[in-house]
């Protein structure tokens, strides 16, 4: 019998579980203050639901053996959009939903096998409005989310913003047979692959210019306007940045416009964004989101209000960035209730109930304690930092 978890899966220890719960609890309280209501879609969905917008590859889905094609959700958005278009179809728009749960994704390992990527996510979806104010609302909520989960200040946070339609405009001058190849080069910032790309030299230099363009929104927008002139996508981004950039700056978050960002997330159509944190090794993407109007259209029976935008935060990744000094538990006292005679067990249970009523964690010794060594060992075993004796 194999005693290890499946490849890619992992066991979380009590401290990791506690921190996950604390982060998710803080986020859920914030979402509710913003008027979002909890929804809990199933972990198992039909494959046509999970692959509806083409944003998720069939190879990334962990399949379920059944009479119909089913799989574990690799992300939560598609399931919520399906629910919004069916069970909540008659509800007035916009719909504001939040969710928290586990998603599963398949990755191919080096040896050709399958690795299961299991992640705990928390996020929101705003469905049924196309206003730019909806995008501003979501980005503002994401910025405020960082404040409530209290990431260690030693980590630098960067909010990257892009637009898939802007990317399409940039790529429109290239041969359609080269588009996917160029997207991959842009996504990977692969300068080596760019040198071997079969395009004219001026086109190669243009791609390199776009790859190097990410930076301060005002500067990037000016560069784009010099190339394309007045454009609705550029104008909307300019309007968005006038509000979001000052809000982010107040929280110590750098905002950058990345024209290549749309290459990374196929689920989105329109605004895309990701929140990246510095770390001790490589940058870590802790949240991502964007517009997914095309996904809503796939599920909707009506052509009206087919709009959606949302984001998800990786609680597992955030957990590693939260300052341990700011991990605020309700009560960090843990009491061992001890007794020397079995006849005092009833009194010990009554004392435990009283401590629980006060919100104090307490455990009872299962045996009478006779010596100091026994007592100290039990304190250590139960990870208690205080003892109460029942005489």
Curated annotation (Swiss-Prot):
SUPFAM superfamilies: Class II aaRS and biotin synthetases. Gene3D superfamilies: Bira Bifunctional Protein, Domain 2. This is ATP phosphoribosyltransferase regulatory subunit. The keyword Cytoplasm applies. One of its GO terms (cellular component) is cytoplasm. Keywords: Amino-acid biosynthesis, Cytoplasm, Histidine biosynthesis. Pathway: Amino-acid biosynthesis; L-histidine biosynthesis; L-histidine from 5-phospho-alpha-D-ribose 1-diphosphate: step 1/9. NCBIfam families: hisZ_biosyn_reg, PRK12292.2-1.
